[in-house]
Amino acid sequence: MRRIDTEILVIGGGGTGVGIAWDAALRGFGVVLVEKRDLTHGTTGRFHGLLHSGGRYVVKDPQSAAECIAENRILRRTHTHCIEDTGGFFVVTPEDEGDYPDRFLAACRQIGVPCQEVPVAEALRREPLLNPRVSRVFEVPDGSVDGFLATHATAQAAVRAGAQVLTYHEVVGLLVEGSEGDRRVVGARVRDLACGEEVEVHAALTINAAGAWAGQIARLAGLTVQVIPGKGALLAMNHRIVNTVINRCRMPSDGDIIVPAHTVAVVGTTDRRVNDPEVFSVEPWEVRLLLEEADKLVPGITGARVVRAWAGVRPLYEEHQTGATRDTTRAFTLLDHRARDGVAGLLTIIGGKWTTFRLMAEKAVDKACEQLGARKPCTTATTPVPGAERGYYWLGHRLHEVEEHHLQGELVCECELVTRAMVENAVRANPALTLDDLRRDLRLGKGPCQGGFCTYRAAGIMHELACHATPSQAGQEGRRWEVERLECPADQAAGAGSAAPVCPPPSDLWNPNLLLRDFLQERWKGAMPVLWGDQMRQERFDELIYLSLMNADHLPDEGLCSPMTGFYGA
């Protein structure tokens, strides 16, 4: 069995895990991160994309609010290009009257969240679709963040600092030495899902940052970490109905936020306790509830087109919590299992929000320094990730580049303005096993057609690249995790001639029929809960192309399965 030796092993490829790898690598530690699927597959890739100002929690959870506003300011410097500076409104609807707005304003001032009351007329001028019956509006520095890009950019920064990032490597066991009362975790046994090979990763310290799966990882060492999985459903509208984050000015509840995100608006969210963190299905009642509540913020939204529904599972934690997940703190917890359970060599970090991932990573690596006997200061608060120099994201950047450089003929995905060069360079730069990986890299298939057209083109491009790859180009050695300008059509077109070699996976996972089947099945899961009106007609059209025109469900795939086939089909 192959063996890898390192100082710190990080389990989990979400925002927190990647942040830990970045922080630890910058402090000079040897770091290996393992993630059982692609980066951001879990909670980080399934939230509403809100960069919290802290306003949502100033009354109910002031500790979390204080952490959010402090990290908000830092991330605007370190991950600038991943953030759209939308600002945020907290609005008082006719159903929200009472003393909460005054308590909200006072709490913002006490905690240090910048907040000012703006005239309703001014708010309606900036957001014409906002409910005209709102009585008060407060402005806070919320923002919209691309969690996929931010996490991949952080991974790139970690790799440049010396870390090793292994996606599609699932932990199948923890390596534990010693007897009862004197046990130590010395690493993990992981399985490469692309080829089936098992690898032992030996480390002086293992950090469990698996989010909603952290309890499952802890059980591999015979430990109990009571994770409270709180499922939140979300909806993507087919266009940006608002350009400012809109919150209900009330205690956090279901369906009380709308976030502009790239070309769409995200309506969220619900909060229901589930037993299994893999439960991502969205129920019809959740869709109805979200639309009905959002209609109180933007009247008429119930008649707008919804292109997709999805859910994420929050990794909430309280040692003795038994009530509703809405009542669980959004602050994070760092567990030292040596002090807590008598098992050395293992830390678990859980809870928190995406906005606080950098702070969570800092505290985890501080504890790692303490246990490994090294005093190395954290520098992530002042170290921008690659791409931050471009400044804030703005919605029209892709259209501007496509038009300025006459790239219309190169478009693979018209909805999200993804060009052929972008697809080719994404495949070369990152360890993509599926088209779903390209969705996270490029927003491929995220528009109203949900991959109805671009899927075939992208699958063909990947197949073509694989056919022209030489044996010496295969493997993971060529993966560079270079993402800082991956979403810029003009840059990718200019760099296409000097692109890196293609590194297909070490098996037939790029079979085009397999790529097609898996990706369209993944898109179908998100479309099923919102099949009515225009989206029903769109999906019927996509189905006719796939089944009737292409006869794609009968194309031979040699019985192949990808690491994601079972998940997509569930």
Positions of PLM-derived features:
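Short hydrophobic core segments
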Residues: 11, 201-211
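Flavin (FAD/FMN) cofactor-binding and adjacent substrate-gating region
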Residues: 92-162, 166-167, 173-184, 262, ...
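Core beta-strand elements of the Rossmann-like FAD/NAD(P) dinucleotide-binding domain
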Residues: 4-6, 195-205
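Glycine-rich FAD pyrophosphate-binding loop
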Residues: 25-45
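Dinucleotide-binding Rossmann-like beta1-alpha1 core, especially the glycine-rich loop
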Residues: 48-122, 126
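C-terminal catalytic lobe of FAD-dependent flavoproteins
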Residues: 147, 226-233, 239-241, 245, ...
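Beta1/beta-strand and adjacent pyrophosphate-binding region of the FAD-binding site
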Residues: 2-16
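Flavin (primarily FAD) binding-site architecture
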Residues: 208-222
